[in-house]
Amino acid sequence: MPRLWIKICGMRTPEAIESAAQSGADAVGFVFHADSPRNVSAEEARALRSAVPESLERVAVFLHPSQALLDAAIDALAPHWVQADSTDLASLRLPQGQRVLPVLRSGGPRPDPLPSRCLFESGRSGAGEVADWDEARRIATGTEVVLAGGLDAHNVGDAVRAVRPFGVDVSSGVESSRGVKDVARIREFIRAARAAEPFPVREEIRR
């Protein structure tokens, strides 16, 4: 049976990173977008990088970045994954071999063919809006979907059972206030997500 991939996004403190690691997350995300309450600079990301244990993958998260911002963030964080809208990724220069996590949105366009893995969320990143689970499940029949958008400890189990995603991603759903991660909510979210496992392997993406 597959193990659900869990990403906690919007890391800004070593304490939140430690909570994610100790609670069994697989990845942590760092947001590089000035309009987000979870924004970190390249310098802040470089300092936080030392707090990320080897058990966690680092994800650099962007929304319409400049090439200069992308380059600085990658240099600082050395991310395992770069997450950005698929249209942004098409116009950016990435280091050779850099793995990407294209973002698809509810009601938005879909690339053809689908990427081997993508993040699916609502129309606005980090707004706590629930994505269209029916649309997500349809996409998940053909590729590995990381489901995001409005998830928290109360609905993630239902989301996993409804969509059968490769993984889940949470940010505002584990915060006590905008941009402030709550270590207890991180634990509760991961516990609830793991409780929804296992679910059958989809034939379409079995390796």
Q: Model features per residue range: what roles?
A:
Residues 1-120, 125-207:
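Conserved N-terminal beta1-alpha1 strand-loop-helix module at the mouth
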